[in-house]
Amino acid sequence: MNHNRSTLNELMADISRKDVERLVKRRSPIKEADLTAMNLEKFNFEGAIFTKCKFTGSTFIGSDFAFSRFEECILDDCEMYGSHMQESSFIECDLSKSDLRDCVLIEVNFRQSILHSVDFSGSFIKDSVLLNVKGDLCDFSFTSLSSANFSGAKMHVCDFTACRSGDLKAADADFTGSEFIGAHLDSSLLQGTILNFCNFSEASLQECDLSRARLLSATMNNARLNTSILNEVLLMDAKAGGTELNDVNLDNANLTKADFSKSIFNGSSMNGVLDQDTIYDGAKLEGVIR
């Protein structure tokens, strides 16, 4: 049996869709196969195992990836629109420039994968793991990111506009230069997260833990951060006009040169705050503890 599998792997460059279907149905692991530009539309990958395979330019539109496992695979420039993934794994894979719009991803593991210019817009992503992923220019606009875990991820200049992401976990992640306009991120854990130059205008970050987060030159106009934890946060040179900061912990925060015009700080704790040249024009600071 082992000899037959090794022979199959040597011939994978010429593998057909029917061959893949047969191997997947038999639960046979597929290794080091070249599946470049293959049409795998509406394919049933349930329980499939792929290791170090190349799928560059392949089509997976409407496919079912339930309980499948991909390790060290190249899945770049693939069409995966409208696919369903439940308890699937893409460990140390490269999904750069792939289209995952309007997909359903439940308990999917993308740990340590490369996500350059991946389009997740409009997808439903729940309880999924994106630990230590690396990427930039990704599109998560209008996605649902319920309980997703981005801890340790580096996702620069990505678009999270209007995404809904309650209970997001992203401790020590780096989202430098990303857009979160109108996003709903309530109850998220963002301790030590790098959010420099990000735009949170009109976003909701209520009851979040942003302790030690870095928001250098961030834009937060009309954002809502009520009852959030922002102790030791860096908000230097931030633009936060009209922001709601009721009952917030800002102890030892650095607000130097930030603009909080017409913002509301009622009932907040601001012990040890650095606010040299900070603008509070028209701000409300009733019951603030300093």
Located regions from the model:
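Tandem repeat scaffolds
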Residues: 4-290
